[in-house]
Amino acid sequence: YVFNNRKQTVAFLNEQAFFDLLIQNDLVELFEGYCMRQGGDLYTFLYKECGLNAAQVKPAILYEVDASNAMDAEHTLKDIDCFMRDAKQRAYIPGSSVKGAIRTALLFDAIQKERTHHDLIDDKRGIPEADYFHTLNLNPKKRDDAVNSIMRGIQISDSLPIDDRNMMLTLKTDSAVNGQTHAINLCRECVAPGTRIRFALTLDQSILKGKWMVNSILEAIAAFADYQNQTYATRFTQPRESVQSAGRNLL
């Protein structure tokens, strides 16, 4: 990636197009020397050592995101965990990820309401999910078979593409319950706070038979978010310069 300290942006490169750029401008040997030495960054190499301009480099750039305060000129070799992107390099959130989050909220809701199963929950065996969700009895010989899960009645599409203007880099910071924080040499590409992301939710009532409706799912999500916040999030120090409170219900 190329970090522009003046613009506070990070540009991710198309590797093939980048090497084409080097070959076309007879910069391969110079790049080999750059790779052999310690330190340095691609921005300085491309624009100062090679003398390239933005128009020449642009074809090698896949996309560009805001680096905010996650990067600085002295620490430009941080690892970056990139966001999920499709074949056209558009950021999106898989529907399966959202369904997994909703599944957790619904399981929490079921545990709170159906206390007859509480004695079956322990640290070694975990939560007997089949007792709560595997109620369709389509494969009575194997209850753990996913075909029996009532979650089949909930379908969530992948999100619509997220504009790169709504993406940003965030610096990973570990926070302890005693208030101490420790910055890690790692950044993550994230969706900027306040961004609305759209999915299509389908509830197949031929399977659900009224067990879950949109309102009941939203109530379960809100209840689990409150539990998560009270039980865990409030025990830790707020992120530095955070614009949203920890534990906020993002769904």
Give the ranges of each region predicted by the language model.
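Small/polar/charged residue-enriched interaction surfaces, especially the RNA/DNA-contacting tracks
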Residues: 1-251
